[in-house]
C-alpha cells in the first residue's frame, strides 16, 4: 500500500522533453512540488547540468545552488529539483545571464537568453478569477500566483504582464482574435500564430483556430492557448525559428541551403 507521495522517478518514465539518455542511469530527478506540473516543468538540475552544461554531476549542481547564485522569477532557489516552467525567468547572478523558459516548435524547453530589461517581467495566463474572504476579488495565474484586486476588465484566458520585483500586474492582453499566441500543450506545442477564430462548444472544449507567419492554419483547445502579444507584436522575445514549425521537407531544404552557402 502506498503511503504518502511518490519520491522517485524512473528515467524511462521521465518526460520526453527533458531529453535524458535512457542508459545513463536508472533514476531521473523527481521535481519538487511547486508552481508547475511534473510533466510540464524542467527541474533546475536538468537545466543547469544537461542544458547549460555548467555542472557534470548532481552534486556540482547542488554546490552551485547552495551558493545562492540561481534566481527564478527574482527569488533565490536552492532546491536542485525546483520545477521551473513555461515563462519562468532564470537568472544566474555570477555570469550575468538571464533565460526565459519557452517552448521550441518540437515541444522542448529552449535555452533562450534574454536581456536584463526583459528579465524584469513575465507573462502569466489567467486561469481563474474568484471573490475571496470579505469580498476581495483575486485572480489565479498558470504559475499558481494569487493576485488580489485585479483590474475588473481582466477575464479568464487573458494574459497579464507581471513585474517580478513587486509581483504586481503592470499590463494585460485580452484573449481576442487577431492577437498573437503560443501553444502550450497538445500536438502543436510551441507553435506561434495569430488567433483567427474561436469555436464555442458548451459542455465540451472550445476550439481555437490559429494561423502562423507562414500562412499555415491549425486548431487546438482553448486551454492550450497562451496569448503573448497584441496584434502580431510579441511582448517577449521568441526563440530561434520564431515558433514556425517546418515540415520534414522544408527542414531538409533549409539544411541543404545552409550547407551549400557554408560550403
From Swiss-Prot:
GO terms for molecular function: RNA binding; rRNA binding; structural constituent of ribosome. GO terms for cellular component: cytosol; cytosolic small ribosomal subunit; membrane; nucleoplasm; nucleus; ribosome. Keywords: Ribonucleoprotein, Ribosomal protein, RNA-binding, rRNA-binding. Pfam families: 40S_S4_C, KOW, Ribosomal_S4e, RS4NT. InterPro entries: KOW, Rib_uL2_dom2, Ribosomal_eS4, Ribosomal_eS4_C, Ribosomal_eS4_central_region, Ribosomal_eS4_central_sf, Ribosomal_eS4_KOW, Ribosomal_eS4_N. Disulfide bonds: none annotated. Residues 42-104 form the S4 RNA-binding domain. The keyword rRNA-binding applies. It comes from the Eukaryota. Signal peptide: none annotated. One of its GO terms (biological process) is translation. Belongs to the eukaryotic ribosomal protein eS4 family. This is Small ribosomal subunit protein eS4, Y isoform 1. It comes from Homo sapiens.
Amino acid at each position: 500500500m502506498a503511503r504518502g507521495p511518490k519520491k522517485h522517478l524512473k528515467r524511462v518514465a521521465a518526460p520526453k522533453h527533458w531529453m535524458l539518455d535512457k542508459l545513463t542511469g536508472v533514476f531521473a530527478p523527481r521535481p519538487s512540488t511547486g508552481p508547475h506540473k511534473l510533466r510540464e516543468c524542467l527541474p533546475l538540475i536538468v537545466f543547469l547540468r544537461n542544458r547549460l552544461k555548467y555542472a557534470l554531476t548532481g552534486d556540482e549542481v547542488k554546490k552551485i545552488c547552495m551558493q545562492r547564485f540561481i534566481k527564478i522569477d527574482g527569488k533565490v532557489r536552492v532546491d536542485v529539483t525546483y520545477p521551473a516552467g513555461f515563462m519562468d525567468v532564470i537568472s544566474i547572478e555570477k555570469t550575468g545571464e538571464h533565460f526565459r523558459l519557452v517552448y521550441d516548435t518540437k515541444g522542448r524547453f529552449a535555452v533562450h537568453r534574454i536581456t536584463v530589461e526583459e528579465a524584469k517581467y513575465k507573462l502569466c495566463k489567467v486561469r481563474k478569477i474568484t471573490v475571496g474572504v470579505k469580498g476581495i476579488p483575486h485572480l489565479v495565474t498558470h504559475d499558481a500566483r494569487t493576485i488580489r484586486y485585479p483590474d475588473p476588465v481582466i477575464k479568464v484566458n487573458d494574459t497579464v504582464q507581471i513585474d517580478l520585483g513587486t509581483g504586481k500586474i503592470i499590463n494585460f492582453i485580452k484573449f481576442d482574435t487577431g492577437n498573437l499566441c503560443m501553444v502550450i500543450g497538445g500536438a502543436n506545442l510551441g507553435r506561434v500564430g495569430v488567433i483567427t477564430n474561436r469555436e464555442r462548444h458548451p459542455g465540451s472544449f472550445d476550439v481555437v483556430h490559429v494561423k502562423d507567419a507562414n500562412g499555415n492554419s491549425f486548431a487546438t483547445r482553448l486551454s492550450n492557448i497562451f496569448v503573448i502579444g497584441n496584434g502580431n507584436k510579441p511582448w517577449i522575445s521568441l526563440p530561434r525559428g520564431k515558433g514556425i514549425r517546418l515540415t520534414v521537407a522544408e527542414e531538409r531544404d533549409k539544411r541543404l541551403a545552409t550547407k551549400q552557402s557554408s560550403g
